[in-house]
Amino acid sequence: MRILVTGGAGYIGSHTARLFAEYGHEAVVYDNLSRGHRWAVRWGPLVVGDLADGELLRKTLRERRIEAVVHFAAVALVAESMKAPELYFRNNTMGSLTLLESMRAEGVETIVFSSTCATYGHPVRLPLDEDHPQAPVSPYG
């Protein structure tokens, strides 16, 4: 299977790409390298691009014949999100929307989205589960 790993030059994304390669899949990494590292991409091709670039996303999905997407690309620091909420909205929210629109345009129907416990905010009860209320307390969440 050919899988696009957004944010694949980061810690979690690069390890995921390695596992895909070990299991015989082709992991195509899509990363803008703003926080990831070129040296971390060792188990498949790297496409340097931003989530905001719908044209490059569509071209990558089409030309690489991508069958599924694992989406890790995000800026992910709570304190920074409080100081620069527009960066988090632009990259995490609008970038994800551009990715989804590009997938739809190219007929790619499968996505795994890596989220965060920051979406829950302050816990109402413990342990947290998927039915817990979503009440983020930061732009990142």
Protein language model features and the residues they cover:
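N-terminal Rossmann-like NAD(P)+-binding domain of SDR-like oxidoreductases, especially those catalyzing
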Residues: 1-141
